[in-house]
Every structure is written in C-alpha cells, then in structure tokens.
Amino acid sequence: MSTQIPMDPPKFLCMPARPLVVGLAVFGAIRSFVQFWMSSGFGMAGTHFCVLLLDLLLLFGAYKNDVFALKWSQRVTFACVLIAIIRFMIYPVVFASYMASGLSRNFTGIDSEEIEILGNVTTPEQNFVFGMISGFTLEFATALSIGVESLKYLLVHRLWEYAKATEASSSSRYVIP
C-alpha cells in the first residue's frame, strides 16, 4: 500500500507555472532582441544583449525542467531582477532630464508627428512638465518590468521546489522484502 502524498504541479492563479515561465521567457527574449536591434549606443545594446542571453538561459532551464537547470534559471532570474532594479534607478531620470532639457528636439531620427508635439513645447515650464510626464511613464514601465521579473523568479523557485520534491520522492522508493 502506497502512502505517497500526491503533488500537484505548481500554478500561478489557475495557470500552470511551467508554460507560463516558458511564455514569459520567450516574450522577454523577443523583447530584448528587438531592444538590442533598435538600440543606438553600445551601453544600451550591451544591457539588452545580457538580458537576451539571460532570458534564453531561463527558457532552457524551464524546458529542461530538472533540479540543476532550474536552480541556474533561478539564479538567472535573480540577475534579471537586479538588472531591472538598476534600470529603474537610471533610465527614468536620464530620460526625463533628456526630455526636460530640450535636447530631444535636436534628435534627427524622429517622426513628423513627434516633431509637431515637440515643436509646441517652447517654455521651460512646458519642458519641465513634458520631462516629468515622460519620466513617470518610463518609471511605470520599468516598475512593471521589475514585477514581471519578480514573478518569473517566484515561478522558477516553485518549479525548482517541485522538481526537487519529485526527484526525491522518485529516488526514495524502498523495496520491502
């Protein structure tokens, strides 16, 4: 008579955790690739490339679904959370300063609709408001990024615990003579 406790695969709300992690990793890899492709500076391209590699490692770990790969995926998602926090501290301030100072009007790679919007902003007060709104918008987006990366970390941790428990239960079958 077996007295095993049934273990259900981990879930987030009603969704299974593993397909959700795979989906988030694929979305993150695509997003990072697009940001890498469209970045103009070496520093920005480097951070996007690092996040792209980390998302691909996370995808491998979620696909492989063993204890070792999931532990490394957990470390990778922790690194992504740290990168998102660093982005949260730097990007909104730089972008808001760029917009508020009026330097954005000197950029030649913008569309005619954006030129019309920027052309109507002429006073220092309007520059300040424009910079503040753009900074808060970017701050919201980076805070959302931190939330998604933290959710991935939580899900990978649950998957790792589940894989560890199922591996331990499958290897601890005693043969009673």
Curated annotation (Swiss-Prot):
UniProt KW keywords: Membrane, Transmembrane, Transmembrane helix
InterPro entries, A to Z: Glam1
Annotated organism of origin: Caenorhabditis elegans
Major site of localization recorded for this protein: membrane
Annotated Gene Ontology cellular component terms: membrane
Keyword Transmembrane helix on entry: yes
One protein family per Pfam: Glam1
Its membrane topology: Multi-pass membrane protein
TM ranges: 19-39, 42-62, 76-96
Compartments, record wording: Membrane
Position of the signal peptide: none
Highest taxon listed in the record's lineage: Eukaryota
Protein name per its UniProtKB record: Glia associated membrane protein glam-1
Gene behind this protein: glam-1
Keyword Transmembrane: yes
